[in-house]
Design a protein with these regions (language model features):
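N-terminal secretory signal peptides that target proteins for export/translocation
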Residues: 1-9
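Bacterial N-terminal signal peptides
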Residues: 10-22
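A structural signal for alpha-helical segments
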Residues: 37-40, 83-86, 150
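A solvent-exposed, acidic/Ser-Thr-rich amphipathic alpha-helical stretch
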Residues: 62-137
Length: 190
């Protein structure tokens, strides 16, 4: 009889424990899992990075080609704590366009070349929002001409959040990471 009571109590405790655990897991929000990226996703995101450099360096379409690489609410951060550009108009201006009218590109000549952007060593990984990435930023010399000490060679990098839209992959957030920090070390500001 004592053994039967002990078994009954053990079973009740086990059932009660399972009910509590089940209720707790049902109430806990499910963490969004990152969907795997396809080979085409990786190609498309790499093309986004390539288009970024060309749109920024050429100020094409008065900077709006650059701005359109972002989501409508996309943000470019100039380092943590630095200024930020939000939305299409501010992003076009960040590329030198918009109200600024691409003056840097118009003034460029052999003696005053435009420093071009090279995004290299891109690492792209799935994330619950779409994908995250980090890469280095390099400014090569132009026609054998160097700019100045702050605009040649490795000048930091980027840390990105990409989302897939009906227009393809776009930047949701991009931070220009300045040395000595390494891309991937920042937490996106809100």
């Amino acid at each position: 009889m004592i053994a039967a009571v002990q078994i009954s109590l053990t079973l009740r405790t086990l059932v009660l424990g399972l009910m509590v655990a089940s209720a707790a897991s049902a109430q806990a929000p499910a963490a969004r899992k990152a969907a795997p990226l396809t080979a085409q996703d990786y190609i498309d995101i790499q093309q986004l990075l390539n288009r970024y450099a060309f749109a920024l360096d050429t100020c094409s379409n008065n900077g709006y080609d650059y701005a359109d690489l972002y989501t409508p609410d996309g943000i470019f951060y100039w380092g943590i704590g630095g200024r930020k550009s939000v939305g299409r108009e501010q992003l076009a201006e960040a590329a030198g366009g918009g109200k600024q009218g691409c003056q840097r590109q118009k003034a460029a000549n052999r003696e005053n070349p435009i420093q071009t952007h090279m995004t290299v060593n891109a690492i792209i990984e799935p994330s619950p929002e779409g994908a995250i990435g980090r890469s280095y930023l390099v400014y090569p010399g132009v026609q054998g001409i160097s700019g100045d000490g702050t605009h040649n060679g490795h000048v930091g990098g980027y840390q990105d959040l990409y989302v897939k839209t009906d227009k393809g992959w776009r930047f949701k957030r991009r931070i220009h990471v300045f040395p000595p920090d390494i891309p991937g070390s920042y937490v996106f500001p809100e």
